[in-house]
């Protein structure tokens, strides 16, 4: 009898993880959902959209901001499960297991490689946009935020309760909390308060067996550590996060000053490299490098734009800038004082005077074809090398760069405290941005080739062994998993997580030995 039981269990496990036996019939998926435990007031199949449903395409495309993965040839899920209750999530997980389907978990849909809504094997999308509660506790200065809420919704709900509290997270307000936090999450408050995950102290998650853990005690410290920067989709379905809100002044000061190479940008960039990571931690100054028309017809040049925010009034900002970066010659007329919540709109390029209620719109206003890559810079780039970089920018034309300064609080937090390892020793992070609007495979190949060409060119100036990368700027070019092996995973894992990768693998092997939760860049199990 014991032998029979063991054989039965082995057969069950084998069936649940073998994608070659996956059931791809959407109707069979709906029937499976209805066989699972259900909430009588909200049947499981009622929230599942299949291709024959008139709303399927609308629901699927609603959170696909990257047109590279919104084509007729893009692999489609057999269903989009728009979960509204924990029971819906449990049922979806149960059917993924029963029918040998992959689960792709989507909160905001901003995965730059489309991994939250595409797959090369039979799959369905578990859409978390129905989970968007933000519960702010002013007494404790904390909040619970569901993983399907956007950063804009989080910021707005905080501002409803207080104009002197905020949260350190991203600048794009349509980012989903679930994906943003699970990759680390950073923005213009990171030099003062660190990353999003540095201010998370609780969470809830559903595991591969449908078990629900509603706090860090029940889920265990290892799992809690892993889902704060290690890619939560490798460990389960995160329901939400308990976060610590941070103090912000009644007024912050923002500015944006641009200079071309002909106007002295090279000198300013050289000074920015030593200034931005070492200045007052209340000040964050991003540098963007873009291509603009030159003074002569048909000539292009590089525009360096310094975009800053100071946690305080403009007079104090000017004191800091005159002391640490006088070369920029920042004037009071360059500065605008505003509430922190209004600075959120400034950083996301909304026109001045836009009502903050726009933050409640979870959808991207304009979709584009997009590619992102990332790097970390640990030593100053010489003037000669900077000249070569600017020359290359003009040559490739399409690439834009954001240089985001570290230092401050980022340099004080140990690299092992969370899976996000890029702490002390980093001067700044580079985000490579390639956006285009023209459709066509040949156009896409051209722009992706330019992105890779520029990335290769930057090799001597950035980190090495490994060449580090930021998970939230996901890039399949640095490695991907075909067979879900440890050897494959280590290629990209070491770049995203450095030494923390091994602990992530150990945790994964302990709590998900069958590798139920996987994608092209998930954490592998150790075999």
Swiss-Prot record:
Residues 1-20 form the signal peptide. Pfam families: BBE, FAD_binding_4. Keywords: Cell wall, Disulfide bond, FAD, Flavoprotein, Glycoprotein, Nucleotide-binding, Oxidoreductase, Secreted, Signal. The keyword Lipid metabolism does not apply. GO terms for biological process: cellular response to hypoxia. Its cofactor is FAD. The modification Pros-8alpha-FAD histidine is found at residue 110. Disulfide bonds join 32-95. It comes from Arabidopsis thaliana (Mouse-ear cress). This is Berberine bridge enzyme-like 10. InterPro entries: BBE (IPR012951), FAD-bd_PCMH (IPR016166), FAD-bd_PCMH-like_sf (IPR036318), FAD-bd_PCMH_sub1 (IPR016167), FAD-bd_PCMH_sub2 (IPR016169), Oxid_FAD_bind_N (IPR006094). One of its GO terms (cellular component) is extracellular region. PROSITE patterns: FAD_PCMH. It is found in: Secreted, Cell wall. Its EC number is 1.1.1.-. Residues 73-248 form the FAD-binding PCMH-type domain. Its main location: secreted. Glycans are attached at residues 53, 137, 293. GO terms for molecular function: FAD binding; oxidoreductase activity. Belongs to the oxygen-dependent FAD-linked oxidoreductase family.
